[in-house]
Amino acid sequence: MALVPKIRNRTISDKPVSSSCTRTSSFRQRLLASCKRFLRFKLLVRASSVSLKKKAARCSQSQQVVKHNDDRIEEHSSSNRGFKDGNNFLVSSTETKKLVAFCGEPFQPLNEEEVALVNSALSKRNRKKILVSHKNSNIDISGETLQCLRPNQWLNDDVTNLYLELLKERQTRDPQKYFKCHFFNTFFYVKLVSGSGYNYKAVSRWTTKRKLGYDLIDCDIIFVPIHIDIHWTLGVINNRERKFVYLDSLFTGVGHTILNAMAKYLVDEVKQKSQKNIDVSSWGMEYVEERPQQQNGYDCGMFMLKYIDFYSRGLSLQFSQKDMPYFRLRTAKEILRLRAD
């Protein structure tokens, strides 16, 4: 019986490899490697583009908020600002370096020594103690008075008025850096409109040149803190831009009355102090709608102070409700140091 050779089926791998197939396979491998390199390059370019866009956006924002000083940066990150357990501020050395790199003056983080200073001042053992005394205003701040800067508290007159005095002194220290401003205290508007209504005579002696050292009309901006029932708002006489401005972190619907009172006051003030008649009929009356607004029932006073702080710097109002814990802590530090930064 003859043996028949067994023939098995060939698979692709059994095919003889020709030189042309080898060249084709090698070409495909090189092409695939090139494609992979191209895709990696494309992803790298895309990531770089996104990063550049983010940086450009931050730069653009900084340029918008800086009006008075072109080299001042207004970008900030508020994710690490706030109170912990009621009064401890979250700042690590690494986070501080990052914040300093991106933050401008209005958002300068506190160091450990400053945080300890505030925590000690707010402690129960210092409630009855006079912590600081301001000679020019005769305002004493006790531990009890300072408690209003804890979270969820309404600001009081002493803390508000002392902070305004510190802003005035800050401006005097560096007049080239800030607008020339006048900061009325919290009792001015109450006197101006108390009793039967508007009464210029009640405040006419508040602004003599002998007391101020300057004429009120020569100021760029005049700030008028306003307390209505349990709510703080702000009136602004802007001599630079010839307009009267009203800012309310809530909407109380009384802006028109306040704007008219400020306009009438300016006319009477100029007439009495310089014997001149000023026509404000062409001045603007502005209720600021695009403004930071509070999201609770107790931060109105802090919003008012920050409106003043930012405007006196020549900055637009680039802050929000989430910054309030930080601003409360910073204000406490500045009052304890008797120096606004």
From Swiss-Prot:
Enzyme type, top EC level: hydrolase
Active-site residues, as the UniProt record annotates them: 231, 248, 300
EC nos: 3.4.22.-
One example of a Gene Ontology biological process annotation: proteolysis
Keywords: Hydrolase, Protease, Thiol protease, Ubl conjugation pathway
UniProt xrefs under PROSITE patterns: ULP_PROTEASE
Single GO molecular function: cysteine-type peptidase activity
Keyword Hydrolase: yes
Similarity comment text for this entry: Belongs to the peptidase C48 family.
PANTHER family: SENTRIN/SUMO-SPECIFIC PROTEASE (PTHR12606), UBIQUITIN-LIKE-SPECIFIC PROTEASE ESD4-RELATED (PTHR12606:SF156)
Function noted in UniProt: Protease that catalyzes two essential functions in the SUMO pathway: processing of full-length SUMOs to their mature forms and deconjugation of SUMO from targeted proteins.
Annotated protein name in UniProt: Putative ubiquitin-like-specific protease 1B
Organism the protein comes from: Arabidopsis thaliana (Mouse-ear cress)
Upper lineage: Eukaryota, Viridiplantae, Streptophyta, Embryophyta, Tracheophyta
Gene that encodes the chain: ULP1B
